[in-house]
Amino acid sequence: MDLSGVKKKSLLGVKENNKKSSTRAPSPTKRKDRSDEKSKDRSKDKGATKESSEKDRGRDKTRKRRSASSGSSSTRSRSSSTSSSGSSTSTGSSSGSSSSSASSRSGSSSTSRSSSSSSSSGSPSPSRRRHDNRRRSRSKSKPPKRDEKERKRRSPSPKPTKVHIGRLTRNVTKDHIMEIFSTYGKIKMIDMPVERMHPHLSKGYAYVEFENPDEAEKALKHMDGGQIDGQEITATAVLAPWPRPPPRRFSPPRRMLPPPPMWRRSPPRMRRRSRSPRRRSPVRRRSRSPGRRRHRSRSSSNSSR
């Protein structure tokens, strides 16, 4: 009996030791299974990272195409920076030891972004350059137009060829003026108005027109303040009249509308006034009604008497 009990105890102890050893050190087959599972997980992670990197590359390609179509350099630099950052993140997820290199790459990508943004801000796009060039060309083309207008306005007026002679005595005639002023140049015309009542007497002034403006200037210098028939005369230049614009064609007068009929001529105020006596009429009737009653009462009293 004692031997059987001892055998049972020894068997129980051996079983417990086997359990402890199994819990402490797993079997080599289990280790292989676990290593296979870990390798599968790693391969899955690598496949996922590869897919993400391929997606990022596809996105970068599409962005590059868009940037090439638009012709903007800033979008290209951003796509390159995003591709570098995607590659750095894939390397960081695959191995923990390359985390420092990923951080350095991300830092370099951020610096490249800042440099690309600064370059894009420094160098404007070709479309903006075209707009700026158009604005500059327009602004440059405006000043010559103003200069031309100012030159046209400042154009010198033609020199006068006609001279007005005033304060002449009534004894002076056209022949006298012809003799005096013909010494300065060829005279084109002499106009000497005469009084209506006395046609043999002049009005005291005359107009002498020369062929050249230089001759008219000579006559002005020598004869302004000179004497004819013992009296000082005045000589002034007559400016050429500005060309008047042609008279405007007046439109024919508009036909007057016929007057409205009599029943339409009355203004609305008269209508309002015409309504007011109608409103007052019942008041007058009320005021007359007591008088009528009095007359009736008097007539009734007379009849009773």
From Swiss-Prot:
Gene name per UniProt: RNPS1
The entry's keywords: Acetylation, Cytoplasm, Isopeptide bond, mRNA processing, mRNA splicing, Nonsense-mediated mRNA decay, Nucleus, Phosphoprotein, RNA-binding, Ubl conjugation
Record bears the keyword DNA-binding: no
Residues with Phosphothreonine modification: T161
PROSITE patterns named among the record's database cross-references: RRM
Region Necessary for interaction with the cleaved p110 isoform of CDC2L1: start-end pairs: 1-220
Record-annotated membrane-spanning stretches: none
A GO molecular-function annotation: mRNA 3'-UTR binding
Source organism of this protein record: Homo sapiens
Gene Ontology CC annotations of this record: ASAP complex; cytoplasm; cytosol; nuclear speck; nucleoplasm; nucleus
One Pfam family linked to the record: RRM_1
Sites of N6-acetyllysine modification: K218
Protein name: RNA-binding protein with serine-rich domain 1
